[in-house]
């Protein structure tokens, strides 16, 4: 199956769906979701491997540019961790809940809608941890969510200001006034300082 997102990537109609997650956010997410070696983990949109390369076996990935479509993936895994494409987030969450009992995603603050929360609860999934992040080189605040299937539990909430550092090289940058000294693009994975 060739998904619409692959067609958009090839035609560059929706370049905002291709944003590589910086290592500092990947490390933060893996720590925040209590990732343990030995868990079966899926990186649903591998990109250049920021998540995948830090995971131990058993691990698997999907990558639409390699014709490995997330929506065709049916194996059960212990954990899914990644940065999903926002333009199809509802469909993405629906499929996520069919193949795992726990997932950790970074999503834009305004993407956590009542409709999505209700749909998760209808499927027995609840947010167990939420981290609000302010990343100066991203255009909005983001949530790192840990969502688990099972009984509703109290939510752990925290806030982390990533600071005015380039996410790619850790050198100071001007945040939103000056998106970064390194002249990188959202699709770059390394600083070009």
Regions found by a protein language model. Give the residues of each.
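Class I S-adenosyl-L-methionine-dependent methyltransferase catalytic core
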Residues: 1-177, 181-188, 192-193
């Amino acid at each position: 199956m060739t998904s619409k997102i692959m067609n958009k990537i090839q035609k560059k109609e929706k370049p905002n769906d291709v944003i590589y997650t910086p290592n500092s956010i990947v490390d933060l997410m893996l720590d925040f979701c209590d990732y343990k070696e030995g868990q079966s983990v899926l990186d649903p949109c591998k990109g250049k491997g920021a998540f995948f390369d830090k995971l131990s076996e058993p691990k698997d990935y999907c990558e639409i540019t390699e014709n490995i479509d997330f929506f065709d993936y049916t194996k059960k895994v212990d954990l899914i961790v990644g940065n999903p494409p926002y333009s199809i987030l509802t469909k993405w969450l629906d499929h996520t809940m069919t193949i795992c009992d726990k997932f950790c995603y970074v999503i834009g603050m305004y993407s956590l809608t009542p409709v999505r929360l209700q749909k998760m609860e209808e499927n027995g999934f609840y947010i167990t941890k939420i981290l609000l992040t302010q990343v100066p080189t991203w255009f909005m605040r983001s949530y790192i969510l840990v969502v688990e299937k099972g009984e509703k539990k109290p939510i752990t909430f925290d806030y982390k200001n990533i600071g005015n550092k380039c996410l790619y090289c850790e050198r100071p940058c001007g945040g939103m006034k000056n998106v970064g000294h390194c002249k990188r693009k959202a699709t770059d994975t390394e600083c070009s300082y």
